[in-house]
């Protein structure tokens, strides 16, 4: 049986068989998209993957799987019955510069949400962005007020977060500040947001393609249990070092 708050090196399809039924609150993972020549970037068969997810997920649990096209279409169609919607992670800079003379650079990455039964859903507030605010005249009071596209008014100042999230999430990558561990690394803050949206403190999150361990780090920072799996020993070692660092940081905050 796989233990909580541990990471494992191996094939996730084999290791997940050691997990109990209905033991996971969230699967959050960034699997291989099959879009590069890297030896690890091979798409895992979807049928056995969903078979294990469906077995180990609790009722009302969620799977959030990142992707870009054409992988996004493949993963959605592999479980169309349980596909619900997409969060779009907006990057600071577009990618695909080598093809910029033939097609637009890509600035979004997808986070595909799957579930059977209505899950927990309490997304953290998102910061109010200037481009989403316009001037609005209230016909009853004849006075101007700030007005959001969601038609919720903002009182007096615009420094407050808005309560209804949009499906576009903007989080900077740690690679911009020198913390580059993996070629497809996602921001810790992005995964913290998704973890907080679909789980509560003490819940269990599985990442069967953990890479350099971003999901596990985000779990530690948000008070969730994690299980991480990856078949590449080098990245498992990187993940261990990152977890040691974040655990030591949390320990120092207590004293």
Each language-model region and where it sits:
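Short, conserved SAM-binding/catalytic segment
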Residues: 1-2, 240-255
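Core catalytic lobe of class I
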Residues: 1-229, 234-238
């Amino acid at each position: 049986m796989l233990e909580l708050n541990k990471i494992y090196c191996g094939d996730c399809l084999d290791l997940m068989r050691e997990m109990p039924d209905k033991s996971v609150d969230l699967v959050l993972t960034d699997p291989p998209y099959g879009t590069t020549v890297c030896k690890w970037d091979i798409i895992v068969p979807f049928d056995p993957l969903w078979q294990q997810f469906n077995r180990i997920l609790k009722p009302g649990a969620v799977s959030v799987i990142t992707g870009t096209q054409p992988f996004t279409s493949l993963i959605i169609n592999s479980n169309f019955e349980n596909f619900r919607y997409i969060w779009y992670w907006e990057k600071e800079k577009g990618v695909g510069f080598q093809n910029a003379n033939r097609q637009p650079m890509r600035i979004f990455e997808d986070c595909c949400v799957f579930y059977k039964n209505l899950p927990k859903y309490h997304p953290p507030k998102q910061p109010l962005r200037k481009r989403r605010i316009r001037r609005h005249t209230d016909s009853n009071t004849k006075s101007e007020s700030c007005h959001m596209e969601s038609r919720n008014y903002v009182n007096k100042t615009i420094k407050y977060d808005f309560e209804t999230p949009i499906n576009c999430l903007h989080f900077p990558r740690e690679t911009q500040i020198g913390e580059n561990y993996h070629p497809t690394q996602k921001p810790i803050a992005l995964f913290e947001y998704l973890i907080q949206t679909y789980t509560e403190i003490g819940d269990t999150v599985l990442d069967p393609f953990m890479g350099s361990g971003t999901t596990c780090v985000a779990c530690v920072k948000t008070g969730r249990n994690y299980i991480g799996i990856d078949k590449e020993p080098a990245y498992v070692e990187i993940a261990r070092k990152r977890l040691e660092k974040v655990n030591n940081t949390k320990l120092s905050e207590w004293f």
